[in-house]
Amino acid sequence: MNPYSSKSTYIALVLAMLASVGPVVAAEDDLGLELDEAGKIKTGAVLQFDLARTYADKEHWSMARSRAELAAQGGGSGFKWKISGRADADAVFAIDSGFYPDAVRRDQQYQFDLRETYVDFSAGDMDIRLGRQHIVWGEMVGLFFADVVSARDLRTFYLPEFEQLRIPQWAARAEYYFGETHAEFVWIPSPSYDRIGKPGAEFYPLPRGANVRGEVKPDASLGNTNWGGRLSRLIGGWDVSGFYYRSLDVAQTFYAVGVNDFQPRHDRIAQIGGTVAKDFGEFVLKGEAVHTRGRRFLSEDPTAPNGLVRQDTIDYVIGVDVPAFNEGHVNLQYFARRAANHDPSIGSERTEGGASILLNTRVTQAWEAEALLVSMLNRTDFMFRPKVRWSAAKNLRVVFGVDVFGGKPTGLFGRYDDRDRVYTEARWSF
């Protein structure tokens, strides 16, 4: 039996079930750019510095990253464009030189990304967007479920805010409105995939000691494109949507290619799902469900091809957001994954559930406090994230926080029990 299979099996299962845990669902355009009446070019920028120190087990600096994001947009009647890019430089590899493997340093020390870069125009009654763009179908606080199109940068786990964690897709998107119904079709000729980093990184998803070969990404071809459609409508005060999406999975499937060797690859999957939301005045109710076919999971069965078995799954989540405290709110969510054709060899139960609670309050005009707890319910496995946010000026925000992980080494959060950290973030937008 593979000595890493039980750990990797459970990790891969829950990773695919529980997506990002962040404070809020961010707006699609973080820079807030708008065209003036004359259609002149507008520009914007964000400068950010993140500093983190891991204090559990081997104490070390785990982040000292400077980030700059620039954007411009313009256009005229019936035509608009946007271009944006982001550059990172992480000095932690100079501060704690030698702590991380060279492969991790090469992957994370310097980086430039083209962010949202697209053109918008109309063709009759249809609106079209071509280029690198965010396509966000999920609307839950703190979790990815129906947001199936987005790729994510997971090299710092699920800790960054969503607008920083999402990776735009190169896509063609067409939208059409008829009555109160909104139809959307997307085609992604060159998909982006989750970034999980290199073995030895702070939040690499497989246990330390696993031998991981280079990731295999599908070749660029018509057969390796992604596509899907979504319908949404307001019915009696309920915002309801349904979608179908066929894609090469943004998440990695770890193939067993040797006794202790794994290789991340991307399988073809199909997903059908929907979302629902309603504002009752005193609270907001939201829910999402996604049925996924074609995804495979690591198995303890020594006869399983490549150490994998196929499991069709249903992910669902229901949440309520209630205004409370001093200009704050409470968010409660229950989420679960159920295997439609459960195979016990994957090392999990047929239904794996969890819950989250988010408490937010304004302490003073400039200070805000927040705490997020996410826990699995089938076993001890949790993450706790208290923090305070200081609005130092109109365009300057500073955050101080702690990230605490707990549980068994096979758990989604427990495997990072020795990565507890304190951090600060300064963000200036202009």
Model-predicted regions and their roles:
Residues 39, 62-66, 110-115, 166-170, ...:
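Residues that define the transmembrane beta-barrel architecture of outer-membrane proteins
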Residues 245, 277-374:
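Detector for outer-membrane/organellar transmembrane beta-barrel domains
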Residues 79-205, 236, 407:
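Outer membrane beta-barrel
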